Amino acid sequence: MNGSLDHPDQPDIDSIKMFVGQIPRTWSEDQLRELFEPYGAVYEINVLRDRSQNPPQSKGCCFVTYYTRKSALEAQNALHNMKILPGMHHPIQMKPADSEKNNAVEDRKLFVGMISKKCNENDIRLMFSPYGQIEECRILRGPDGLSRGCAFVTFTARQMAQSAIKSMHQSQTMEGCSSPIVVKFADTQKDKEQKRIAQQLQQQMQQLNAASMWGNLTGLNSLGPQYLALYLQLLQQSASSGNALNNLHPMSGLNAMQNLAALAAAASATQATPTGSSALTTSSSPLSVLTSSGTPSGQPAQSAWDAYKAGSSPTSSTSSSVNPMASLGALQSLAAGAGAGLNMSSLASMAALNGGLGSGGLSNGSGSTMEALTQAAYSGIQQYAAAALPSLYSQSLLSQQNVSAAGSQKEGPEGANLFIYHLPQEFGDQDLLQMFMPFGNVISAKVFIDKQTNLSKCFGFVSYDNPVSSQAAIQSMNGFQIGMKRLKVQLKRSKNDSKPY
């Protein structure tokens, strides 16, 4: 169907083929032409029909092509979500057809930064007009109407935009700007969504820093003072190695070690004391000193150390039997305060113990168990340091893990294999591997892909070389929010059991 005689045989090179939905199934091409022609000369209308019926019936949608791009955009602005046709319940849907996506606005739109605030739209158009026809030029302005020093420029073709980037990016430094001009493709909606998710993930990882090491100590409530002593031993050894965090108070590691010693002494005294009383009194307890926020930096540790040297006694009638392991959470104030930076290795060892003590095999205080406990602590240093303090942990250590695990489907021992639901659509094998590496040695990480669409099914498997790591991952990552959903992390079903764990 050709248009009127005052038009060429073909539409303009930048014309758009539009898809139109929510039209009556009884309408013919002539009726549709009457609908579209008020906005410009129509080159072609093609009603989509169901060929399985005889005669073929309209599907209630069509394609329309105007001679000019301007006419198509005017029709879209006037009709899309604006007009409801007779017999229909929803407004017309009008948008560029899928075949036009290769010339979508996002592929032709440039962001221009570091421009002089004295420039107006005409100046920017003049600057970019040598590279092709400009469809739109807009300077970003604040509430006061003043330029923010950046703009969006949309060309009619992607090649023009690419030429502008190649010639203009960092080609000059404009008046009042500290850096050369920036010319790049503007962020698409997908780019913005990915940035939002990444920012949200970073914030949640920061929250995880505190929770992953201190919030998970509740499972250790039944353990005795020998484990406190081991914490102290690990802290002493790591402090003597000189592997302390930079930019923190030099005495903070010693302070933490002294406080742990006081805690260990108090815990020992607690077990030696009858049930009715406790060495951890409200008046002289090292814990009460530890949690005091009004004391200047350095003094809490010294006070606790003095209490340890002098010995604690149940002098208060309101003695409480505070659980020594649960009370370890008081050390969080040391790690969070300005004067309290625990040695990195000691934090890692403590976090490793936190994961290692959760397994059923480490339930008594025998010598062999203590040796196994120490081994578990040191083997987990790198893994759990990344989980507890990712912002302070060297990324090079993470890269030492077997990156080839991404995409493989190798299974670990019983209880070391995880099933992860609600993964973001854009997550791949490598993303899954990076997310679960901090909790242990990952031997495989696989996101499942739909073979027909080649898109993620939003679930996957992760396998560790030991069950302790998988439990630590479940404890920290189950319920972890990414975007609008929360991850669901659980053990993979046993080969010998049809029911989940």
Curated annotation (Swiss-Prot):
Intracellular or extracellular location(s): Nucleus; Cytoplasm
Biological process according to GO: cell migration; determination of left/right symmetry; developmental cell growth; digestive tract development; embryonic liver development; endodermal digestive tract morphogenesis; lens fiber cell differentiation; liver development
InterPro entries: CELF1/2_RRM1, CELF1/2_RRM2, CELF1/2_RRM3, Hud_Sxl_RNA, Nucleotide-bd_a/b_plait_sf, RBD_domain_sf, RRM_dom
Low complexity bias spans: 274-298, 312-323
CDD domains: RRM1_CELF1_2_Bruno, RRM2_CELF1_2, RRM3_CELF1_2
PANTHER family to which the protein is assigned, alphabetical: RNA BINDING PROTEIN
Summary of the function given for this chain in its UniProt record: RNA-binding protein implicated in the regulation of several post-transcriptional events. May be involved in mRNA translation activation and stability. Involved in the regulation of muscle-specific splicing of alpha actinin pre-mRNAs via the binding to the UR-repeat element (URE) at the branch point of the non-muscle (NM) exon.
Name used for this protein in its record: CUGBP Elav-like family member 1
Lineage start: Eukaryota, Metazoa, Chordata, Craniata, Vertebrata
